[in-house]
């Protein structure tokens, strides 16, 4: 399951780098949880053909992540925001101050997304 989640995250960031066929097969595998046999039947190719396309596409996504690191960076930023929020969750604040604090954190997350394009 972890592998499929990671593949889905990589697809969300780097999908435009794949061919249309790779996209289709990887999405069926990662998002729809289809078996190789199900994908082969849908696509009209052999199970081995699906495996080859799946492996080539996944390798390209992993190589791109190793070079660019968007998924890794986003995970670090999310962890830092979560840690910051948890550290201050028990600090007594008035409701309006708590709302402002949460708003600033959401804005910060949005800035990171805008800068990274994710």
Where are these regions (language model features)?
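Short alpha-helical "recognition helix" segments of helix-turn-helix
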Residues: 38-40
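Key DNA-contact positions within bacterial/archaeal DNA-binding proteins
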Residues: 47-48
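Short amphipathic alpha-helical boundary/capping segments
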Residues: 9-18
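Residues within the DNA-recognition helix of helix-turn-helix
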Residues: 53-56
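Intrinsically disordered, low-complexity basic tails/linkers immediately adjacent to helix-turn-helix/homeobox/MYB/SANT
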Residues: 67-93
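C-terminal flanking helix
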Residues: 58-65
């Amino acid at each position: 399951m972890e592998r499929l989640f990671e593949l889905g995250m990589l697809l969300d960031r780097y999908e435009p780098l794949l061919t249309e066929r790779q996209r289709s097969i990887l999405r069926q595998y990662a998002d729809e949880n289809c078996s190789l046999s199900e994908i082969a039947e849908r696509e009209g190719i052999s199970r081995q053909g699906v495996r080859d396309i799946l492996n080539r596409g996944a390798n390209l996504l992993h190589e791109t992540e190793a070079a660019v690191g968007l998924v890794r960076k986003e995970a670090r930023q999310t962890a830092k925001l979560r840690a910051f929020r948890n550290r201050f969750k028990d600090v007594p604040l008035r409701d309006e101050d708590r709302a402002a604090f949460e708003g600033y954190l959401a804005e910060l997350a949005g800035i990171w997304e805008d800068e990274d394009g994710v």
